Curated annotation (Swiss-Prot):
It is a multi-pass membrane protein. GO terms for biological process: carnitine transmembrane transport; carnitine transport; cell differentiation; monoatomic ion transport; organic cation transport; spermatogenesis; spermidine transmembrane transport. The chain crosses the membrane at residues 19-39, 156-176, 190-210, 214-234, 244-264, 268-288, 356-376, 389-409, 417-437, 445-465, 475-495, 501-521. This is Solute carrier family 22 member 16. Keywords: Cell membrane, Developmental protein, Differentiation, Glycoprotein, Ion transport, Membrane, Spermatogenesis, Transmembrane, Transmembrane helix, Transport. Pfam families: Sugar_tr. Residues 530-560, 579-649 are annotated as: Disordered. The gene is Slc22a16. InterPro entries: MFS_sugar_transport-like (IPR005828), MFS_trans_sf (IPR036259). It comes from the Eukaryota. One of its GO terms (cellular component) is plasma membrane. The keyword Cell membrane applies.
Length: 649
C-alpha cells in the first residue's frame, strides 16, 4: 500500500475536522493524566526530616540555641546537613538524646544540654520515628517507616518506576502494532484507572510497590501509543503541532502535581484528587476508533472504509472510496499471505544494515535527550525547601518551548532541528559548567534553560521517530526508543559519584554526547512534508533523487521497466501485449541501460553466453513472426526490448 495514497484520505475527509478535534481532546486529557502519574512519584519517595521517637511525651525539645515544646517544630528547622542530636525532656523528667536512627538515655536528669560526661545508654528506635510535618502530614515513607535500616526500600521506589516505564513502553507498543492502536489504548486506559484507584487502598509496602509499578507501566504504554494514534488519525497539515502539543498537556499534568503537593499536605488526599482528575477519560475512551493507517496496513479494508465514512460524516465532508483510491494496493495485498502482512518484531528495526544504522542513531538521540532531561531536572528541583515551586517552573517553561519548536519546525527540516537543539543544549550545558558556584540562582536558571531545550528535543523526537518508520512497526519503534532512553535514568543516581571524580564530569559527558548525537542525526532521512509510510516496501520504494527513508536509492542492477512505455509501444506496433517485465518492474522507472545508451538507441547485442543466458531468440526459436521488411525503427525498438529483458531475468 502506498503511504501517499493513505495520506490522500485526509484531503477528502479533512486534516483536522470536528471528529479529529474530539478525538484529540480525549487523547490530550489522558496525556495530562499520564503526566500526573509519572511525576507524582517524585513526592511519594521523598524522605522527610525525622528523628527517633522517645518513649514518652515530650515536655521540651532543644536543638542548639533553639527550643520548642514540640519535637516536630524542631524537625521543621533542621536540614539534612545537620548531624547533631536533639535533646528532649519527657514529662516524667527523663532526658534523651535523639538522632535520626537511634536514641540515648541519660542517667543524670538535671542537665539538659550538649555538654554531658555522665552515664549514657543507647537503645534502638522501638517506638518508631517522628517526622517533619511542615511539608507532608503523611506520606508513603512515613506510613511504612522507610528510613534508617529500611531506607533502601524508599530508594527502590524510583528504580521500580523506571523499570515499569521501560516495560510498559515496549510491551504496549508491540501490542499496538500487533492488535491495533485502539486495543492498546483501551488496555492502558483501564490500567491507569484501575491501578490509580487501587493505590488509594493499600496498607503495606508490597502492595504499594505493585500498584505503582503497574500504574506507571500503563501510563508509559499509553503515552507511547497515543502519540502514534494522534499522528495517524490527523492529517499532514495539522499533524506536527498536534503531536508536539501532547507534551504540553503532559507538562500541565506536571504542574498540577506541583500545585497539589503544595496545597495538599496529606498523602491519601493528594492521591484521591489526582485519581479523580484522571477518571473522566475512562467514560469516553470507547469513542476512539482504529486508525485508517493501521487497518489498511493489516488489509482490513472494510473496517477502514467504515472509519473513514464516520470521520467524513462528523466533519461534514465527502468520503472517499478506498477501493478506488487504493485499487493498486488492494490488488497487491491479495497476493500477500497473512504472515507476510503481519510482521511485528523488534528484529524488524534491524532488518538490513541501513535500517539498523538508523535505529541505533535514533536510540542514541533518545538516550541523550532523556539523560539531559532528568539530569538537569534533578539539578533544578534539588532544593528541598522549594521542590513544588521548581517543578511548577519546569512545567511552565516547557510550554513556550513547545510553541517555539512548532514554529521552528515549519521553517527548518527535521534533521537540522535535531542538530540545532542538541548543540544549543550542549552549549548551555557548558555555560552552566563555567559559571561560578556562588551564583546559585543563576546556575539554577541556566539548568532550567537546558531542561527546556532538552524537553523540546524529547517532544520532537517522538514525532521524528514515528515519521521514520512504517505503520507496521511505527509504535514498536517509538516504544523501544522510549525504553532505551530510560536506560539513562539508571545512571542518574550515579552522577553524584562521577562528581566526586570531577564536579563537572556529568555535565561534560552530557555535552559531548549531545554534540555527537546531533552530528549523527544528519545521517537520518529528512521527513518534513513527506507522507507517512505504511510498510517497509513503501519505505524502500522512494524516488532515487530524494533517496528513500533508508538513505539510498534502489539498486542499479534491479531498475524497473517503465510499464507506460511498454504499453505505448504495444499500442504503437499492434503487439498483443507489453513487455513481460512491465508489471514486474512497476511504473515510473527506466530500463537499466536507458541512461547508458540514450533514448531510442539500442545497446550492443549481448553475445550468447556472455551473461550466463542465451538470447531470447535462441531460447524460444525466434519471435514466431517476421518483422516488417522496411521498418528499421520497429526492429531497433524490438531489439531494445529483447536486450532489456535479458537484464531483467
Amino acid at each position: 500500500m502506498e503511504s501517499c495514497n493513505v495520506e490522500l484520505i485526509f484531503d477528502h475527509i479533512g486534516h483536522f475536522g470536528r471528529f479529529q478535534i474530539v478525538l484529540y481532546l480525549i487523547c490530550a486529557y489522558q496525556s495530562l493524566s499520564c503526566g500526573i502519574h509519572y511525576l507524582s512519584s517524585v513526592f511519594l519517595s521523598i524522605i522527610p526530616e525525622h528523628a527517633c521517637k522517645p518513649p514518652g511525651m515530650v515536655r521540651k525539645a532543644v536543638f542548639h540555641n533553639v527550643s520548642a515544646w514540640r519535637l516536630e517544630d524542631i524537625l521543621a528547622l533542621r536540614s539534612p546537613e545537620h548531624k547533631d542530636h536533639i535533646m528532649v525532656e519527657l514529662q516524667d523528667g527523663e532526658i534523651w538524646e535523639l538522632t535520626r536512627c537511634s536514641r540515648t538515655w541519660r542517667e543524670n536528669t538535671s542537665h539538659l544540654g550538649y555538654e554531658y560526661s555522665g552515664y549514657k545508654h543507647d537503645s534502638p528506635c522501638f517506638d518508631g520515628y517522628v517526622y517533619d510535618q511542615s511539608k507532608w502530614r503523611n506520606s508513603a515513607v512515613r506510613n511504612f517507616n522507610l528510613v534508617c535500616d529500611q531506607k533502601w526500600y524508599a530508594r527502590m521506589i524510583q528504580p521500580l518506576i523506571i523499570f515499569g516505564v521501560m516495560l510498559g513502553s515496549i510491551t504496549f507498543s508491540y501490542l499496538s502494532d500487533r492488535f491495533g492502536r485502539r486495543m492498546a489504548l483501551w488496555c492502558t486506559s483501564i490500567g491507569v484507572f484501575f491501578f490509580g484507584i487501587a493505590s488509594l487502598f493499600i496498607f503495606d509496602y508490597l502492595s504499594f510497590m505493585i500498584t505503582r509499578f503497574f500504574l506507571v507501566m500503563a501510563s508509559s504504554g499509553y503515552f507511547v501509543v497515543v502519540f502514534v494514534y494522534v499522528m495517524e488519525i490527523i492529517g499532514k497539515k495539522a499533524r506536527t503541532w498536534a503531536s508536539i502539543h501532547l507534551n504540553t498537556f503532559f507538562a500541565i499534568g506536571a504542574m498540577l502535581v506541583a500545585l497539589a503537593s503544595y496545597l495538599l499536605k496529606t498523602w491519601w488526599l493528594y492521591q484521591i484528587i489526582l485519581c479523580i482528575v484522571t477518571t473522566p477519560f475512562i467514560l469516553c475512551c470507547w469513542m476512539l476508533p482504529e486508525t485508517p493507517f493501521w487497518l489498511l496496513s493489516e488489509g482490513r479494508y472494510k473496517e477502514a472504509q467504515g472509519t473513514v465514512d464516520t470521520m467524513a460524516v462528523w466533519n461534514k465532508s465527502s468520503s472517499c472510496d478506498l477501493v478506488e483510491l487504493l485499487s493498486l494496493d488492494v490488488t497487491r495485498s491479495h497476493n500477500k499471505s497473512p504472515h507476510s502482512i503481519r510482521k511485528h518484531r523488534l528484529a524488524d528495526l534491524f532488518h538490513n544494515l541501513d535500517v539498523a544504522k538508523m535505529t541505533l542513531i535514533v536510540w542514541l538521540d533518545w538516550f541523550t535527550a532523556n539523560l539531559g532531561y532528568y539530569m538537569f531536572g534533578k539539578e533544578v528541583i534539588r532544593r528541598k525547601e522549594n521542590e513544588p515551586l521548581y517543578l511548577l517552573l519546569v512545567g511552565a517553561m516547557e510550554i513556550p518551548a513547545y510553541i517555539c519548536l512548532c514554529i521552528w519546525l515549519k521553517r527548518v527540516g527535521r534533521r537540522k532541528t535535531m542538530l540545532l537543539f542538541l548543540l544549543v543544549s550542549s552549549l548551555t550545558c557548558m555555560l552552566h559548567v563555567v559559571m561560578p558556584s556562588d551564583y546559585k540562582t543563576a546556575k539554577r536558571m541556566v539548568a532550567l534553560l537546558v531542561k527546556s531545550v532538552i524537553s523540546s528535543v524529547f517532544a520532537f523526537i517522538y514525532l521524528y521517530t514515528a515519521e521514520l518508520y512504517p505503520t507496521t512497526v511505527r509504535c514498536l519503534a517509538v516504544g523501544s526508543s522510549n525504553m532505551v532512553s530510560h536506560v539513562s535514568s539508571i545512571f542518574i543516581p550515579f552522577t553524584s559519584h562521577f562528581s566526586k571524580v570531577w564536579i563537572f564530569l556529568p555535565q561534560i559527558l552530557f555535552g559531548i554526547l549531545a554534540i555527537l548525537s546531533g552530528l549523527l542525526s544528519l545521517k537520518l532521512p529528512e521527513t518534513q512534508d513527506t507522507p507517512m509510510k505504511s510498510t517497509w516496501e513503501t519505505t524502500e520504494q522512494q524516488v532515487p533523487e530524494n533517496k528513500d527513508s533508508l538513505g539510498e536509492g534502489p539498486p542499479d542492477s534491479f531498475e524497473r521497466w517503465d510499464s507506460s512505455r511498454a504499453l505505448s509501444f504495444a499500442e504503437r506496433w499492434g503487439l498483443s501485449r507489453a513487455s513481460p517485465d512491465a508489471e514486474k518492474w512497476g511504473s515510473g522507472r527506466v530500463p537499466p541501460d536507458a541512461g547508458k545508451w540514450g533514448a531510442g538507441i539500442a545497446p550492443p547485442v549481448t553475445e550468447r553466453g556472455a551473461s550466463g543466458r542465451a538470447s531470447l531468440e535462441d531460447e524460444s526459436g525466434g519471435s514466431g513472426r517476421a518483422p516488417p521488411e522496411k521498418n528499421t525503427e520497429m526492429e531497433n525498438e524490438i531489439e531494445n526490448m529483447k536486450v532489456s529483458n535479458l537484464g531483467g531475468f
